Amino acid sequence: MAKHKIDYTRENGLPVVLTTIDKLVNWGRSNSLWAMNYGLACCAIEMMATGASRYDFDRFGTIFRASAKQSEVMVIAGTLSKKHAELARRLYDAMPEPKWVISMGSCANTGGMFNTYAVVQGCDRIIPVDIYLPGCAPRPETLQYALMILQKKIRREKANRNQLPKRLV
């Protein structure tokens, strides 16, 4: 029990608020990201390793979800073929706003070594990408670092309920 009564209010009786609602909402958003793993090739193995006990993605507040309707972050890991492009777009459209996309690996970024008619040469041609992870295949630490960069990006954004969806120009 405290022996002294501390008055945290001003003379008006109103408490002092030292933050903005944007910072509070963005802090909550950045520390509880639910990711949908869209693993297509070798990079998916490294992405699955981030959820294991050695790297422990959960300590950053990120939980992998199987449903697009419960996810805020989409991690595209691997070669995106033209057959998968329509499905990837539908899954992206099913995600609630605000939503972010991480493109993981050279194949997801640029098509990789597969320069054929059946491979999309970069998933940013189908959906807007926020963070690109280079490498073949990127290590789990790289995905964790990308998540921390995404958290910083979310904290800087303006928390607006009437956000316009991201569009490709």
Curated annotation (Swiss-Prot):
EC nos: 7.1.1.-
SUPFAM superfamilies attached to this UniProt entry: HydA/Nqo6-like
GO cellular component: plasma membrane; respiratory chain complex I
Keyword Iron-sulfur: yes
Topology of this chain in the membrane: Peripheral membrane protein
SUBUNIT field: NDH-1 is composed of 14 different subunits. Subunits NuoB, C, D, E, F, and G constitute the peripheral sector of the complex.
Similarity remark: Belongs to the complex I 20 kDa subunit family.
Protein name stated in the entry: NADH-quinone oxidoreductase subunit B
